[in-house]
Amino acid sequence: MILKSFILGNLVSLCMKIINSVVVVGLYYGFLTTFSIGPSYLFLLRAWLMEEGTEKKVSATTGFITGQLMMFISIYYAPLHLALGRPYTITVLALPYLLFHFFWTNPKHFFYYGSTTRNSMRNLSIQCVFLNNLIFQLFNHFILPSSMLVRLVNISMFRCNNKMLFVTSSFVGWLIGHILFMKSVGLILVWIQQNNSIISKKYIRSNKYLVSELRNSIAPIFSIILFITWVYYLGRIPSPIPLKETSKTSETAETEESEEETDVEIETTSETKGTKQEQEGSTEEDTSPSLFSEEKEDPDKIDETEEIRIDKKEKYLFGFEKPLGIILFDYKRWNRPFRYIKNDKFDNAVRKEMSQYFFYTCQSDGKDRIVFTYPPSVATFFELIEKKISLFSTEKLFYDEFDNPWKSLNEQKKRILNKIVITRILLLDKGSPTLVGDVLQKRTQLCICNDETKKEYLPKIYDPFLSGPYRRRINLLLGFSMLNETSRKNDSENIWTNKIHAIIRNNNNGFFDGVTIPYKANASDQNSIDLTEISKKVPRWSYKLIKEIEQVYDITDGELVLDYQIRSRKCKRVVILSDLNKIKKISTSTPTSTPTSTPTSTSTPTSTPTSTPTSTPTSTSTSTPASIPASTSTSIPASTSTSTSTSIPASTSTSTSIPASTSTSIPASTSTSTSTSTSIPASTSTSTNEIKSKDEPKDEPMEQAIIRYAKQWDFRREIIKGSMRAQRRKMGIYQLFQGANSYLFLDRHNFFFSDFCIYIPRLMEKLDRLRIRTNTELPISNNGEEKTREDLKNEKNQESINLKEEKHIQIAELWESIRFGQLVRGSLLITQAFLRKYIILPSVIIAANLTRILLLSPPHFFEDFKNWKKEIYVKCTYNAIPLAENEFPQNWLTDGIQIKILFPFRLQSWHRSKKIEKKDFCFLTVFGTETEQPFGSAENPFLFFKSDLIELREFIKKKKQQLKKWRTKYFRIFLRLRKKVFRKINIAKEKWVIKPILFIKKRIREFWQRNPILLLQLKEIYKLTEAKKENNSIISNGMIQSSSGSIDSIILSLRERKMKELTDRINTMLKIIEKMKKDRQKELLNTKINISPNKMSYYDKIFESQKNILKILKKRNVRFIRKSYKFLKFFVQNIYIDIFQGIINMSRINGQDSKITKSFFNNEANQERIDKPNQSIIISTIKKLLSNITNKNVKNQNLKMFWDVSYLSQAYLFYKLSQTKIINLSKLRPVFQYHGTSRFLKNEIQDYFVEVVGAHEILHSDLKQKKQKNLENSGMINPWKNWLRGHYNFDLYPIRWSKLLSQKWRNRVKQDRKNKDFNQCDSYEKKGLIDYKKQNPFETHYSLPTKKKKKYIYDSLSYKSINYEDNKDSYIYELPVQVKNNQESCYKYNKDKCKFFDILTDLPIDKYLVKNNYLVKANIRDLEKTMDRKYFDWRMLHFSIKNKGDIRVWRHNESDTNSKKNTQNGVKNFELIQKINKKIIKKIKKKELFYLTINQDKKSNPSNNKKQIFFDWMRMSEKKISRYRSNSNPKWFFPKFLILYNAYKIKPWMIPIKSLLFDLNENEIFSKKKLIEKKNGNKAKKESVAKEGVDSVLSNHTKNLQKDSAGADVKKGIKKKQSKKKIEGKLGVLRTGHFRFQLNWPNPEISKSLFMNLNGFSFMLRRLDLKKLSLAAIRNNEFSLEFLLPPSDDITFHELLEKGIFIIEPVRLSLKNDGKFIMSQTIGISLVQKNKYQLNQRYQEKGYPYKRSFAESIAIHQKRTENRTSNHYDLLVPENILSPRGRREFRILICFNSGNKNDIHRNTAFDDGNKVKTDDQVLDKRSKHLDRYQNQLKNLKLFLWPNYRLEDLACMNRYWFDTNNSSRFSMLRIHMYPQLKIR
C-alpha cells in the first residue's frame, strides 16, 4: 500500500510538474492563438469554396499561414506589435484596403489573364489571393481581441526563466493549432461537397435550381460580409479631421496640448522603483490591446516635443515637429478621444485621465535628469534604433558638442543677472529714499484675503507663483483642506471617517470666496497615511464653464454668458407657481418639528450636509401636488445650513413629501437662488427654482419652476463642446425606450432568462400551494394562508400600478419623440375641451332625456344642465400643476399642456346609483375621453349613457317576464281555436271539388291507355311518382283510418290530382330542354358557314383590336420611360432658370437702388456728415461702413461671412471689441467709475456706450454731466495703430476677410508678414524708424526688408503692446531718438471743408448721364493736407448732385512709352474734373459740354513744363516716362473688363494721394502757400490760383486740339468734303486716346446705338466746332437721334434711373485674393480715423541697447524724455529696475487684476497702504505737463491689456519665459484662483 501511494504521489507530482512546465504552458498559449478568429478567415474560406485550381488554394493557404506567423511574432516583438496595433493601420491601411477589395470583387474577370500552366505564378490574380490572405491577417483582432491573450502570454513569459523555451513551445502549439484548424475546415468542406447532392435530392426536390443559386450567391455573400466588416471598422477609427474648437481656445489649441495634461499616479510602495521592470514590461503596460479592440481609457502619457534651441531659435529633429517615433506610433491618434469633464472645485474643465508614468533620463541645462518622458514602447523603440545606428556609425560623438547650447544659455542668463545687479547698484547710488523699496526684487505671492488691511498669503507650498505648478502630495484619508478648528480637536474621532463623508464635508464655495490654508497633519497622523497621490491639475479653459441648462434658464449666478460650453440633457423648464401676491417666507423646520398641513402629508427628516460640522442636522419637507408620487428623488442646492420647506398653494387637497430615502446633494450656489430638482415617477426628474432671496424686495413675485428631464438615454454625458467624446463600445438600439447597452455585454443582460427567473419562482409557489391544499396530511395554519394571500394581492396591485406607470411614461415619451408633438397635442386638447363643453355634452343631455321620455320615465333637463354648468376646465402645466382658469402656462406650445376637468359631468340618473363613486376631477385626453392621470388610459366614452342603459335593461327584463306570462296564458287558447276553424274549412273544400276531380281522373287514365310510348319514356318518372304515391298513400291511409268512411273517397281524388300536376311539370321541363338544344345546334351551323379566309367574325375583330391596343400602349410606355428622365431634367432646369433669373434681377435691382440712394440722393445727410469735424470714431465708422453689406446679406441667411477677425493679429484687438454685439459691462465698471481724468479717448466713445450699449447705470454721475467737446485736437491714437500704420500690408477691408479662411491666413501670415519699422533685429527696447537719407518719403514703401524671424515679430509685437508708453504718442514718453521732426505727414483734414473722396479700383465705375450736361465735381482744396492717405476708400464718396448733376469719370489712357527697368505696361490715369471758377459754371449753364483731357505724349508735353501734373501710380519716385501706345483696342471686345485690363495688372493698393497727383521729382512746384491761399485771400486770388491749377492740368495737347478746332472755323475756302474727312479723321484717331468708359444696357440692340452716341459725346466735350462735329456724326450714322432727350428742367436724374434709361452695374474684380491685400484693406478702416500720426524716417541704431553699457541705456531713457520738464522716468513704474524680460514678466502678472486701481503696480514687501504712492497718484501730480488724451491712453491700456490679451499671452507664453512644460510659469494657471488678488 505504501508503494502504491508513493507511486501515485509521484505520478501526481509528475503530472503537476508537466502541466506547470514551460513547454506545456507554451503549447497551451500557442494553441489559444488559433482561436483569435477574425474576418481574415473569410478570404481563406472564400478561396477554398470558390476558387478553381490548386494554385489559388495553395496561395491562399500560404498567405494565411504567413500572416498568422507575423501576428504570432508580433506578440513577442514589441516594435512589430506597435506597428501593427497602432490606429493609423486602421485608417490608412485597413479601411481603404477593405473598400477596394469590396469593389474589386464585384466586377467579374477583373484580373483574369486566362489559364496558363507554365506562368501560373506570374498570374496577378494568384498573387492577389496571396496578398489578401497575408495582409488581412494583420487586421485579425475582431471577435476575440488579442489584448487579453497578449497580457496572459506576457505574464507567463516573464514568470518563466527560460523564455526561449516558452517561445518555441508556444510556436509549436500555434503551428499545431493552425494545422488542426485548417485540416478540420478542409474536411468539413469536403464533406459538404460530397453530401451536397444527397442533401439536395432528399430535401430540395421541388426546386431544381436552388443549388445552383446557392453556388452563385456565395460571392455576393462574401462581399456583403466584407462590406459589413468595413462599416463596422468605420465606426471605430479615429477621425483624421481636426475637431471644431471653441472660439476662446482656437488660437492656443496647439500650444496648450502639450502643457495641459493631468497627471495622476497612485504609488503604493515607493516612487523611485527601478525603470528596468517598466522597460521590460513595456509591451505589457503600454501596448494597445488590439487594432480593432474596444477602446478603453488608454494611459495618458507625456509626448511633449523635445526641441533643440540654439541661440533662441527653435529647431526640430530631422525637420519634424515631433520625434519620428511619436509620429509613427502616436498613441493619441489624430484626435485622442479625451473627454473633458467639469471640475467641481475649480469650476473649470480638467482632464482626469489615469496616466502611466515612465521615468527616463533627459538632459536639462546640460545635466542628466530623470523626467517624465515617452511611453515605454517608444523608449524601447528608440533604444533599438540607437543600437542599430551605433553599429553603422564609425565616428564617436563627443558629449561636449551637445553641451554648447546649454552653456550659451547659461552664460546669457548670467549676463542678464549681472546687468540687473548693476542697475540696482546704480539706483542705490542715487540716494533717493523712495527708490529703496524699488531696488529689491520681490516675488509675487497670492493673497487669500479680500480685505486690504489684512495680509494673508498662501503658504509657499501651495502658491503657484512661488513653488511653480500645482504638484504636491495629497492625503487621501480626509479632506483636510476644509476642516475647521472644531474638527481638528477631534482628530481621534474623525481620523478614520469614511471617505464618502469626508467628500460630502468639503465645502466647494471656499475655492471662490478664498482658499483657506490646508490642514497640516500631525506626526501621529502621518504614520497612518500610506496612500499618497501626485497630482497636477491644469484647467483647460480660463473662464467659468456653464452648462446648457444654465444658459437656457439663466442659472449663471448673475454673470452674462454668451454661449454654453457643457452639454446637458434635454430638459424643459416648467413654471409650477407664479404668485403675484406676497408670499410668506420659506419656513424652516428642525428634525423635531412636524408640519401640520393635511392628514395625507408626511414629513420625514433628511440630514442635510452643511458647511460646518458643528451645525445640527436639519430636515427638508416639501409639499408637492398629488400628481408627483412619494418616490421622487431630489437634489436641493442650498448655500445656507437650513433646509427649505416649500408649500405650493394649489387646488388639490393631497400632497406628498420627500421621503427619507431620497438622495440629496448640495452643490455650490450663491445666496440669490436655491433650486430643488424633483423627478416625476420614473420618467422625469425635476428641479425647482425658488427665485426668492433675502436681497430681493418683498413685493417681487415668487416663482417656482421645475426642470423636467425626459427619460431617454444621454450619450453626451456633460461633454464640453469642442472636445471629442470618448470612444465607447457601439450601442445597438432595438427598442423604443432603451438604455446605453453594448452588444459585447449581452451576457450581462438576461434577455431570455430574465422572464424565467421572474416567473419560475412564482410557478413553484403556486405548485406548492396546490400541493398543500391537496395534501391533507400537512397541517397549515390559517394565519399563514391569509398572509400569503394578502402578499399576493399586494404584489399584483403593485405590478399593475408599475405597468400603468410604464405605459404612462411611454405615452409621454412618444409625444415628445414626435416632432412638434406637444404643439399638436395641446391644440387637440383645446379643441376637444371646446367640443366636449359646447357640442357633445348638450347633445348627450338632449338625447338622454328624449330616450327617457320614450321609455315613459320623467326627464331631467334642469338637473343635467345644472351639472353641465358646474364642470370647469383648468389649464395645467405639463406636470399637472393647475393654473388660473383663464391662464395658459408659459411656452405651452413647446413644453406641453394638460387640461384638468373639475366636477366632471354625469347624467342625473347616474347620481342616484350607489355603486359608482363620485369623482371630483379627471384629465382630458386627446380623443376627448377622461382619464385619472395625465397620459393615462382612456375610460369608456359611453359613461354618460350608463345609467340610462341600466334602466332600459331593467325595463326590458320586466316586459319580458310579462310577455312570458301572457304568452303561456293566451297562446294555448289560440291554438285550440285555430284547429277547429281549419278543420271545418278543409271539409268544405273537399266536398266542393270531389266531382271535378273524379272526372279529370278518368280522362287521364284513358289518355295513358291510348299513348303507351309516352308511358315508357316516363317510366322512371312514374317510379318516382309511385314511390311518392306510396308514401302519400301511407300518410293518407293513416288519415283515412282516423277519419270516417265518407271522407275516404275525397282524399283519394285529391291524391290523383297531385300526381297529375307533377307529370305536367315534368313534361314542360323536358320540352324546354329540347328546344334549347335545337337552338344551340343552329347557331353552330351558322358560324361555320360564315367563316372565310378574308373575313373575320365580330368576336375575332374585337379580340384582335384589344391585342393591338395593348401593343401600342406597351410601346408608348417604353418610350415614355426612356424619355421621361430627359423631360423631367429639362422641365426642372427651366424652372430653376426662371427662378434664378428672377432672384438675380431682384438682387441686382435692390443692390443698385440701395447703392444709388445711399450714395447719390442723400446730399444733405452726406454733406452734414462730411462737414462735421471728424466725427467718425472707430465704432461708428465700422457700423456705417458695414451697414450696406449687412443689409444686403439679411435675406441670404445661408451666406456665411467670417467676421471674426481675431485671427488677423494680436494687435487687431480694439476692432474686435467694437464688433462685439454684447459687451460684458461688469468688466468696464472700473473704467466708467474712474474718479480721475476720463479714461475715454473721445467723448463719442463714452456717448456710444451710454446710448447703444446701455451703460447708464455704470456710468459715474460726473461722467454723465460732461459735455461733448470739439474733437479737433483729439484723436484715436493707440500704440498698436502706430505699429499698424507702419505695416501697410495689413490695410484690408473686412469684406475681403470673409473670403479668406483662417487656417490659410495663418499659414500666409507666418510667411508674409513684414515689419516695416524694423530694419535691424533689435532686442526688446526698440522703435523702428524709417531711414530718411535725403530721399523721397515714400520710397521706403518699396525698400523694406522681405523676411523677418518669428521670434523677432513676437518680440516687437509684445513689446509694443505692453511698453507702448515708450512711444511718442503714449501718455508719458516720446520716441527713443528724435530725428527729423520738422516734417509731419499727418491725417489732418480741414474741418470746414469736404473730405477728399477716395476711390478703390475694385469697385463700380459709375457714369451718369444728366440731360445733355456732363459734369464731374471734386474738391482738391487742401490737397496737400490729405496727401498721405494710404488708400482710396470708396465708402467715403460724396457727390453733390444739384440741378445739372455731377459725374465722376474714369479715363484710362495708354500712351507711347519707352520701357525701363522695374516698369510694367498699363498706366492708369485718374482724372478729376471739378468746378473751379464762375467762368466754368457759366459755360455749364450755357450747356457747353467740357471734358478735361491729359495726354502723356512727349512731343505735346515737354518735360520742362513744371506745372504739368503727371500721374504714375507704379513708379512714384522715378522720372516721367513715355509708354508704348497699343494699336489694339480691347474695349471693342470686352468693354466690361477694360478697366480690369488696364488698372489691375499691377496691384497698387497702398499708394498715397501725393504720389498720385504729383510728380515726385517736381513736387516743389505746388507749395503749401498756393494751396492754402483760400483762407487769407480774396475771390480774385482764388480764381487766379484755381485758373492756374486748371491751366496746369490742361496739357499742350489740349491746346493743340483747340487750335485745330478753331482753325476749322477760320478756313472758309476749303471744300466741305475735305472738312468732313478731317473731322471724321479726328473722330477716329483721337477717340482711342481720349475716350474710355464702361456702360451696360439691358437691351443689347439699344446698347450698340447708345455706344455710338457716347463715342461722339465724349469726343465733343469742350469742342469749339460742336455743330460741325455733330452734323458730321449724324451724316455718318454715328449718332442716333432716338436717344437724345429734349432740354427740359422737369426731368431729373433720379427719374432717369427709375425709368431705366441707365442701368449702372458694378464691375467685379477678377483678381486673386492675396492675403496681404486683404489684410491691408481690413486694417485700413482704422487707419482712416487717425488724426495725428508722425513718421520719423530714420533707421534705428544697430545692436541691442541693453548689451551695451548701462550708461548708454540710461542715455536712451534720457533721450526719450528730453522734451519733458523733469526726468522722473524711474519713478513712474517701480519694476523698471528689472531687465526688460523680467519687467515684461512682472507686468503680465500685475495686469491680470489691473481693474482694481488700488492694486496696480503695488509693491508686495513694503506696502502698508499709506506710504507708497501708486502710479495713479504720481500721474495726478504730473497731470499739468501731460496731455489729457495721453492719460486716457494709459487708462485704456490698463483696461484693454488684462481683459482681452490673455489669449495672446498664452500664445507667446513659451517664447517669453522659455518654458516647455510650464514648470516655471504658466498664464493658464492663474484662473484657478479667479477672485484672488495679486499684491
From Swiss-Prot:
Query: Which Cys pairs are S-S linked?
Result: none
Coiled coil regions, renumbered to chain: none
Q: Where is the composition biased (Low complexity)?
A: 586-688
Q: Where are the transmembrane segments?
A: 18-38, 64-84, 87-107, 124-144, 172-192, 218-238
Q: In the UniProt record, does the keyword Transmembrane occur?
A: yes
Cite the effect that the entry attributes to residue 1435 to K. In strain: cv. Baekmibaekdadagi
Q: Name one GO cellular component term.
A: chloroplast inner membrane
InterPro entries annotated for this entry?
A: TIC214
Q: Where is the composition biased (Acidic residues)?
A: 253-268, 295-305
Q: Which domain of life is it from?
A: Eukaryota
Q: What is its main location?
A: plastid
GO biological process: any one?
protein transport
Tell me how this protein sits in the membrane: Multi-pass membrane protein
Q: Enumerate the UniProt keywords alphabetically.
A: Chloroplast, Membrane, Plastid, Plastid inner membrane, Protein transport, Transmembrane, Transmembrane helix, Transport
Function as written in the Swiss-Prot or TrEMBL entry: Involved in protein precursor import into chloroplasts. May be part of an intermediate translocation complex acting as a protein-conducting channel at the inner envelope.
Q: What else is known?
A: There is a partial copy of the N-terminus (positions 1-222) of ycf1 in the inverted repeat (CsCp100, ycf1-A, CAJ00805). Sequence shown corresponds to cv. Gy14/Chipper.
Q: What is this protein called?
A: Protein TIC 214
Instruction: State the organism named in the record.
Output: Cucumis sativus (Cucumber)
Print the organism lineage.
Eukaryota, Viridiplantae, Streptophyta, Embryophyta, Tracheophyta
The encoding gene is TIC214
